[in-house]
Design a protein with these regions (language model features):
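Alpha-helical transmembrane segments and, especially, the helix-loop junctions at the ends
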Residues: 112-129, 139-189, 193-206, 364-377
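Short helix-coil transition sites and intra-membrane helix breaks within transmembrane domains
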Residues: 23-27, 65-68, 79-89, 116-128, ...
Length: 383
């Protein structure tokens, strides 16, 4: 009976966290409340609530921040410079211009994919692409309601998790646990990319054609965001920072770090080169790209550089802290006795180790209600 109540309580806590997040409540507040509800259902009034919050919850919170704050910070600075330099807008305009209005959905998807694969934050890509997507969809007379799907397919799927070399945090989180780099399992990654991209485009094309047959067009909207027509750099200059990240990341992770003596990490830092080299490769790639953008656009950036760097640093905190909050929730759920039961069930779903890992991580990510935060919590539990 106690186990059943505990499992019910865990799902109640997850549901509460999801509902509060969808309602616009702060995850930073909702996550610990949901975690303590799970503790209450599992242990009753003997749940040691303060210890669960200040020790278990905050340990998961702090560990995630320690491991991934540099990636969030560098990513935010890179994204900010790509935005204010006009590079992101230049890439978006180039892709949509070359593919044309008849391939509006494909142009938006590919542009988002290029930007996210180059290291631009998912959130920034959504904001940068919205005005461009609006202009393209309006010209092609495609329903506006399909814009979120097109942006999500390009930014939040294969370039976020599957395409080899992606610097997005969801692709870099596993490096710490598996001792790999961001280029790990390239064949599987490419296969997954083809499935995600192909399936997503097939669905979006189906919905577009269905809307056209029904006579549904873009529609009329007031006070709409429109694409900024400011002067932007040439496509070669705009795309260079993305190539820099990819090349530096690849060279360091495949050629440099494998030949470096990392024994000092074990002796002085209680760590290993394998656990850190992947993250370092991504960070250094972003750093070189940031310096390149700043140098090339110095005259354009110098006046507001201090303020923009400050904004970028501040903007890196919100997604990081939200993910930390959810990882803290995952740390509490992992400490519950019922979590072991659910974990054993998840791991025993299939005798195939790879399939079992895929299914179990999906289940545990669902339990922790976050992509990056849930992935970190799931890998921590399965490590």
């Amino acid at each position: 009976m106690g186990t059943t109540i505990g499992i019910i309580g865990l799902f109640v806590a997850i549901a509460l966290l999801v509902v509060l997040a969808f309602k616009g409540h702060s995850v930073i507040i909702a996550a610990p409340i949901a975690a303590l509800i799970a503790v209450l259902f599992s242990y009753g009034l003997k749940g040691h609530f303060m210890a669960s919050y200040t020790i278990t919850y905050m340990s998961g919170f702090a560990n995630y921040a320690k491991n991934y704050f540099p990636i969030y910070l560098f990513g935010a600075v890179f994204a900010k410079l790509m935005d204010i330099s006009g590079n992101a807008q230049s890439i978006a305009q180039f892709c949509t211009l070359k593919l044309g209005k008849s391939r509006a959905v494909l142009s938006v998807v590919l542009t988002c994919a290029i930007l996210t694969y180059g290291g631009v934050s998912l959130f920034v890509v959504a904001f940068v692409m919205l005005p461009v997507a609006i202009a393209v969809f309006r010209a092609a007379d495609i329903p506006k309601r399909l814009i979120p799907g097109a942006i999500a397919l390009g930014a939040f799927t294969f370039t976020m998790t599957a395409l080899p070399g992606s610097p997005q945090v969801q692709n870099t989180i596993p490096m710490t646990y598996f001792g790999t780099d961001s280029w790990a399992a390239p064949v599987l990654g490419i296969i997954a990319t083809v499935i995600m991209f192909g399936g997503g485009m097939a669905w979006l094309s189906y919905r577009t054609n269905k809307a056209k047959k029904a006579g549904e067009g873009y529609g009329n909207y007031q006070d709409e965001i429109v694409s900024d027509n400011k002067e932007v750099p040439g496509i070669g200059l705009a795309f260079a920072p993305i190539l820099i990240i990819l090349v530096v990341n690849l060279v360091l992770s495949k050629m440099v770090y494998p030949n470096v003596d990392g024994s000092y990490l074990e002796e002085s830092f209680n760590s290993t080169l394998a656990a850190n080299s992947g993250t370092w490769s991504v960070l250094l790639g972003m750093l070189v790209a940031i310096l390149f953008i700043a140098a090339v656009n110095f005259s354009k950036l110098k006046d507001g550089l201090k303020d923009n760097l400050k904004k970028a640093a501040n903007e890196s905190l919100a997604p990081l802290i939200n993910s930390c909050a959810v990882v803290g929730f995952g740390s509490v759920t992992k400490s519950l006795a019922i979590f072991g039961i659910i974990q054993a069930f998840a791991l025993g779903i299939s005798s195939n180790a790879l399939l079992s890992e895929v299914l179990s991580i999906n289940i545990l990510c669902g339990m922790t209600a976050s992509a990056s935060g849930g992935l970190g919590a799931a890998l921590e539990a399965l490590a």
